[in-house]
Each structure stands twice: as structure tokens, then as C-alpha cells.
């Protein structure tokens, strides 16, 4: 009887860990695109979030740019990536239904319509001189979203990196 209880408890803990790992991710900031808010090497806790719950001003993690576009230096494109499968960290500037921010996003100056279309986001780095973002690429599709940054993780409290 006691062994069955221990087994059930262990199974419950294992399921909780799996669920947490699917909902949360720790990402290491690389590059200078989010200075001064986030510095290279800092780690942030990210919660998986559906695109429809985003608001302008939130910091998000999205799948990144696969490679530099023509005219960009590859080093600058690589600096935009976080750890994991090419994550980037950016601040949401506009969500579907918001006015297109033509004055701050040159790539969208000639975009059709007056509102950000459904399924698209406008994201910007806090440090424009070192950020590959919507200023150059225009809209990013919302399906690239992983989640919202909840907080920085204190390096002293986090587990050692491998």
C-alpha cells in the first residue's frame, strides 16, 4: 500500500514537471538589441502565451530570423538570437487591430491598410542600432510567438549552465 502511494506521488510530481516545462522556458539573452532593459547573458523566464493575449509594451520571445537578409552583416543577425531554436527577444509595438506604426517602422511605411492585420505583430528591440526587428523586416507572423517574458532570473538562484 505504501509503495503504491509513493509511486502515485512520484508520478504526480513527474506530470507536474512535464506540464511546467511545456508552459515555461528559460531563455538567455544574447546580443545588445534589448539594452538597457535586458543585457547579454541575463536569463529570463518566459511563459507560453497565445498571440491574442498580447498587449503593446510586453516583452516577448519569438522564433528568430534564420539568416541575415541581403545587405545585413551575418554577425548582427546572429546577435539577435537567444539560446534554443533561434529565439529572439523583442518588445511588442503593435498587435492585430492596432494602427500601423508607420512613423517608427520604416519597413511598414508603404504597408496596405491602416491597421495591423490579423495574425501579425510589430516587434522592436529597445536598442534600435543593434536590433534586427520589424523596422527592417516589417510584420512578424504571430505563429512565431513562444511567450511573454515574466521576469529576469537571478543568476545566483538559477541552476548552473551545462
Language model segments and positions:
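Extended hydrophobic leader/signal-anchor segments used for secretion and membrane insertion
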Residues: 1-162
